[in-house]
Amino acid sequence: SGALYVSLDNPYMQSLSLFEFAKEFEQLGGEVLFVDEVHKYENWSTHIKNIYDALTLRVVFSGSSILQISQQNSDLSRRSIIYTLENLSFREYLELCDIYKFDSFCLEDILQNHQSIATDITKHIKPLMHFKEYLQYGAYPFILEDKDSYHQKIVQMINLILETDLPYINNIDISQIVKLKKLLYLLATNVPFIPNITDIAKATNISRPKVYDYLEYLERAKVINSLKSKEKGYNIMAKPEKLFMQNTNISYAITSTIDIGSAREAFFVNQIKNALFSQTRLLDDRIFGAKKGDFLVDDKYIFEVGGKNKDFSQIKDVENSFLAIDDIEIGYKAKIPLWMFGFLY
């Protein structure tokens, strides 16, 4: 068919020149080369660049280290388009696990038509039952392999990021890894964490400038999410207003003492960021901390996140304000089930 898949973590592929391999494949009639685990191959971006420049072969490459790929991607500017595969949405989880296949909805659809959409969805599934499972086990496709070892695999994934990816791209001394793990545990057990950088530095024995650096690395690695206040604008040096685990599955993997309020907010931030972030925008500017309410989305909508007893007292008389409420199947007016924000992508 003219297509070939190779994985560069294979020892045989490690012994070859990727460019020469691609050249020979093209000479034998190859048209498309799929290259997996590309970050495991030394100077992979140079080889991809040379293939692009010298051959007519099309190349699709992928890797599981977003940090290592993004570091070398600058070599491929104007030659490649990089797509980031985010964690599964609640809707994708339902489809992957063969529970039910639903369409996704844009944010405006959910805000305006959530009652009719939820009424239709609840004819097919019990969303609250599956949502609780999703918060613990639904973010990554390897839930299909084995539920019992699911959280262990997440811990292994985080260890790989801390012990391999970060030192590789940032020249972090190995002695700092223990401090990084301490920092991550501190965040996991206190999210949504309202950061005091000085206190974090003291608790982890990391210097204040390094705390900022490490938080940025962890966010780029998709381990945490940070949120700034809109009032502070785009001040690069402004500390984050809140810190969350990137998704709730990471929280459950790191600690058994999960605050449900934290989990709700982390889910909301995760799904909004994943659904609305566009790589055509210079900054991730779709969601901020809000002065009234919890979150400001698209400079227009105010959201307060909570349990079913949450009321509008904190966002009373605020225009375009909504409650994202857990533990309800179907909402009413500006009161929207939290699980529905898992249908954005």
Language-model-derived ranges and their functions:
Residues D53-N73, L218:
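Sensor-1/coupling segment of RecA-like P-loop NTPase cores
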Residues F34, R58-S64, T84, A324:
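Structural recognition of the conserved hydrophobic beta-strand(s) that form the central parallel beta-sheet
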Residues D98-Y252:
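Interdomain hinge/linker elements that couple catalytic modules in large macromolecular machines
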